[in-house]
A protein has these predicted regions:
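Active-site and substrate-binding clefts of carbohydrate-active enzymes
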Residues: 2-230, 238-240
């Protein structure tokens, strides 16, 4: 890499959960010495490979140009983001492509779906996302010097843990205890940030569908209703 291009820069990042969070990874990474061996191997290449941080790279190297990064993830994730019918069509195209001599040129243009489509494909994900934005706006309106700002913001950040808003091979959106944890932190953050009287009623577009919903809130509960669905109660929160 260093010989092909002057000042070549490779960026390495990996999931923190792979470093002791996943089953058996603690033993593999720490006790069996994978992490120490990994860094020792990198250091042994010091005559041509220099290890630097992200901030050091920004300071030392000028940008080579401008790019716009799309929302993206690994290949399987982009496939799962598609509607169910689209997944079958994507697989059909991928299999047909596999036997073509120019397949390696076409792969970059066949990326699957839009990662944000998880919020459309799964109503549970969109509901969490909309509630998160509602709570985020409340916290953003707080005085940053107030005593409640940092505790409320911390709870919001916990509620923004991304794993529950999508799914992979295992874990994610379809595990109810993860969604429960998101809502628990959202309710805690909202309770800290709510500047309304103890009991109030509001009509706003809470779930971002361009139609107004009705929210009734008191110290014990939040109740969300959809008038256009005959007063459907679509969310009932029990506050901590």
């Amino acid at each position: 890499m260093g010989q092909r291009r002057e000042n070549a820069l490779a960026v390495y990042a990996d999931d923190g959960e792979k470093f002791g969070g996943w089953p058996k990874t603690f033993k593999h990474v720490y006790e069996d010495g994978w992490l120490e061996n990994f860094f020792s191997t990198l250091q042994a290449q010091g005559d041509w490979l220099k290890l630097i941080t992200f901030s050091e790279a920004v300071e030392r190297f000028s940008p080579r140009g401008k790019i716009y990064l799309p929302d993206a993830s690994y290949r399987e994730m982009m496939e799962w983001a598609l509607p169910v019918k689209g997944i079958f069509q994507y697989e059909e195209v991928s299999h047909a492509l596999g036997g073509q001599p120019w397949a390696h040129l076409a792969r970059r243009f066949i990326k699957g779906g839009c990662w944000r489509n998880f919020r459309v494909k799964y109503p549970e994900a969109y509901q969490m996302y909309a509630r998160m934005l509602e709570v985020s706006k409340k916290i953003a309106s707080l005085d940053r010097n107030s005593e409640i700002f940092l505790p409320a913001e911390k709870e919001l950040h916990k509620a923004q843990c991304n794993d529950a808003y999508w799914h992979g091979i295992f874990g994610g959106l379809y595990l109810p205890h993860l969604r429960t944890a998101i809502f628990r932190h959202l309710l805690t953050a909202e309770t800290l940030a709510d500047s309304h009287p103890k009991t109030y009623l509001e009509t706003l577009d809470y779930d971002l569908d361009t139609k107004k919903e009705v929210k009734i809130s008191n110290p014990m509960i939040n109740a969300y209703f959809k008038p256009e669905r005959g007063g459907h109660l679509y969310e009932l929160d029990y506050k901590p």
